[in-house]
Structure formats: C-alpha cells, structure tokens
C-alpha cells in the first residue's frame, strides 16, 4: 500500500470514513452532537454536505460524545459512539448506539 497523506485544515479528531453506495461519509468527535459529512470524493470534505443527525437532548449523555462510527448493517444505518454522563467524568463512559429509521443516514429525522 502506498501512502499519500491527505492534509485538512478542518479540526476533526477521531475521524471515521465509510464508503457506501458510491458516497463517502465522514464522522468525527464533535463533543455535543452526532454529525455526518457526505462527499463524492474522499479527498474533499471541505465542500461536503453536512447534517446533524442526533443531539442528546434530555438523554443525559452530553457533553462527552466522542469517537462516532457509522455502519450500514443488514440494510439499516447505525452509529456507535462513546458517551459520558455529565459531571461523572471518564468513569461513566459507555458505548451507545443510535439507529436510523430511514434509508438515508443524512436524514436528521431518521
């Protein structure tokens, strides 16, 4: 495998990229939400379509949302991520899962 790093000016810790149906999807740690970026080109997320697909609201798992991963499993979209309860710190970290009810992972109503 040859390696040619792609440099980005965008701050995106814990990046996760998935290629599905001819499209690239990017997720990364934002801290307070789950956001997906969509691009036709893995080298250009600067001009990506962006969608916040989930906010913790009253679920009690904010602000420590990090390391999200988007997966398409058996025809359904899932996001696995870590979360922590406010005020409890790293000891409260848990793996959480949200599932889209739609075929489009970018749909915030999913």
Q: Each predicted region: which residue ranges?
A:
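Carbohydrate-active catalytic/glycan-binding domains of CAZyme proteins
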Residues: 1-110
